[in-house]
Amino acid sequence: MALQTPVLSPATPTVMAESALYRQRLEVIAEKRRLQEEIGAARRELEEEKLRVERLKRKSLRERWLMDGAAEGPERPEEPASKDPQSPEGQAQARIRNLEDSLFSLQSQLQLLQSASTGAQHRPAGRPAWRREGPRPLSQSAMEAAPTAPTDVDKRTSLPDAPVGMSPESPSDPREESIAVLPASRPSTEAIGTSSEANGPCPGHSPLPEQLSLGVSSVTKAKGDGAVEVVWAGLRATENSATGPTDVELEAKVEEVVLEAIGARQGTSSPELPTWVKEGRGVVEVVWEGLGGRDLDVTGESGRDAEATHTSSRRLQEQFEAETCRKEEGASRDSLEGVGQGGPGVEEGSFIWVERVALSEDWEEILMEGLEAPQGAGSAGEPEALIGAQPRGGEASWEVEKREVEKVEGIEEKGRAEKLGAEREDGVAVLPDETQGREENEAEKVERKDSEGPFPAEIATDEEKWEVKTTEGEESLEVEKGGEAEPVTTEKPLVTEKKPEGSLETERKGSEMPLDQEKDGEGSLDRESKTTEILLDGEIGDKSSLDETKGSKKLLDEKTGGEGSLDEEAEGSKKLLDREADGIEPFSEVDKTSGAKDDVSPEEQGKANEGAEFQAEDASPPGATVCVQDEPRSEEQGQQEPEKQEGLVEGAASKPEPCTEREGPPGDATLLLAETPAPEQPVESQPLLHQEASSTNPGDHPAPTYAPAQQLELAEAKEASGPKQKTCQCCVVM
C-alpha cells in the first residue's frame, strides 16, 4: 500500500527526509483517491441493487395480485422473498448486504488513512491508533477487511508533520473526518468539569484567568440540614478586575452556569417546583459570588424561580452607595464596588449575592404573587436594585418576591425588624474617628461577609426575635408607614429617617464613603455610621449582645482592616450601628438624588421612633433583615425611640454591614465564612443555614398571633415604593 515506505529515523538527512515525506504524501494522496473511487463505485452499485430490488418487489406484487384476483396485502408478497434465498429478491438483498459491508470497509480504510496523514501530527508516536477507539463501532471488521491496516498503524507515526491545511487532499466525506476528530477532544473536555461549552459562548475577550480564578465552576451541595447550597466560586473578581469581562460575556457565563446548576430553570409563572427543589427541603440557599453588572438579571431570574430572592441587604446597600457616589462624583473607588468600570449605570465590582429561598406548600401562591411585577422587570430590575441606587420598577418585582418569602416565613421578619430598631438604639454610639480607608476596607469586607452569614449574636437571638415579633408586630406595621422602604433593607432607611435630616444626609454620605467616598466629605459621620452598624449586627440586641457585637466587630475588623482590638470592638459595635445606617443610607442617598430624602427623614423620624424599624425589617428580605433583626429587640425596644433616630441614621449610613449581618450560607463565601464566625459566641458559630432554616420555616417557631396579612401588605407597598424613593414610606403606605 502507499504507506509502506520505510520509517524514517531521526538520523536521516533532512533533504532525504523531505523527499521521502513528499513521496509519502503523494502516495497517501493516491491511495485516498483510489479508496474514494472504490467507495463511489460501491455506492453506485448499491443504489442500483436497491432500485432493482424495488422493481422486483413491485413486479412480484403485481403478479400475485393478478393471480389471486385481489390484493390481499403487501405482506404476503414479501414473505416468500424473505424466506426464499434463491428467489431473485433474496439474492438482491444478499448482494445489497455484501455491498454495504464492502462500502463500510472501504470507508473505514479511507478514514484510517486520513487519520494517519493528518492525525499523527496531533498525537505522540506511542498512540498512533487513537482515532479508531470511539467513532467506528465496526472498525474491527474494517481492519480485517483491509490487509494494509496493520501497516497503516505501524507507519502512521512516520507520516508528514505538516499542518492539515497544507495537504492538498480533502476527505471524501467531511462528516467522517469530523467524527474521527471529535472523540479525541471529547475525553479531555469531559474529564475537566468546566469545559468551554459549560461556560457558554464568550462574545468578546474572555476574562483573565485570575479574574475568574476558579474557572466558572459551580459546586452544588445538598446539605443534610435541608438546604441546598450553590456556591459560585468561579466568577469571583480579584482586585484587578478593571479589565474584567464585559456585561455580555458575564451574562453568557452566568446564564450557562446557572442553567447548568439549576437544571431546568422554570419561570415564575410555572406553578410546579423547579427540578432541583426536593419536596422535603425547607430552605434553598444560593450564594452568588461574581462580578456585578447589568448581567445580574440572569441570577435574578434564577432567584425568581426559587420563589423569592433574598439578597443580602448589605451588599445591595453597598452597591447602591457605590452607584450613587459614582453618579455624584463620577469616579470609581478603590473598594470592590469601584474596582470595575466607574460608569454611573454600571457596577462591575465583586459582589457576593446570597439568595435565601423559602420553599413551602405556598410555592404556587408565592410564584403567582411574584408575577405582580412583570417578569422582565423582575429579571432586569433585581440586578439593577442590587447594582445601583437608581430605584427601578425591577426592584418592585424583586421586593414582591421578598414579600412572598416573608409571607411564607410569617411574621418572623417583623419581629426581627423590631429587634433591629432596638439594636440600632443600642448601637447609637458613633465613632467619627474611623478613617475612610478603614471604612472602604470594611465595605469591601462587608460585601464578602454578605454570604458568610449573620453574626452569631443574630443567630443566638433568633428565638428572641420571634417573641419580640409577636409583641412588636404592630410596631412593625407602624414602622412600615413611617420608615422609608429600601428594596433590600427597609430597616436601615427607617433608622435614617429617625435621625435629623442633616445628620441623615451626613450619615448617608458617610455610608457612601466606605464604598465610593462621602458625597459631602463627611467622613466622620460615615465612619460613625459604619461602626454603629457593625455593632448593630451583634450588639443592638441586648447589653449581653455587646459581647456578641464585639465578636461580630472582630469579624468586621478582620474583614475591614484587621481591627481586632477590644477597644476597636467597642468602636466596632458602633460601626455595626453605622453600617446598618449605611444599609438605610443607600436609600436615603437615593432620596437625596430624587430630592425627597430630606422630606422623608423628618416625617419618618417620628414614626420610626414608634417602630418603623420593625416594619422596615419586615419589608426587607428575610435574609437581609435577619442580620440586624436577629438581635433581641425586647430589651432594646425601650431604648428604641430615643436612640432610634441616631442609631437608625447611623444604620442607614453603614449600608455594607447589614448585608454582612444578613445570613450568608455557612460556607457561602469561601474566604468570608472563616472570617465572619465569632469564636466567642457558640450561637454565632452555628451555620447560618440552620438559622435560616428556622427563620424560613414558620413552623420552627410559634407563629405570632397578630394579623400578618396587613403587615405583609404594608411591607409589600413599602417595598414596591422603596426602589423609587421619591415618596416617604408613610406617604406610600397611606
From Swiss-Prot:
The modification Phosphothreonine is found at residue 311. The modification Phosphoserine is found at residues 139, 158, 167, 170, 172, 270, 332, 335, 451, 601, 721. It comes from the Eukaryota. This is Paralemmin-3. Palmitoylated on Cys-728 and Cys-730 and prenylated on Cys-731; which is required for membrane association. Belongs to the paralemmin family. It comes from Mus musculus (Mouse). One of its GO terms (molecular function) is ATP binding. It is found in: Cytoplasm; Cell membrane. InterPro entries: Paralemmin, Paralemmin-3.
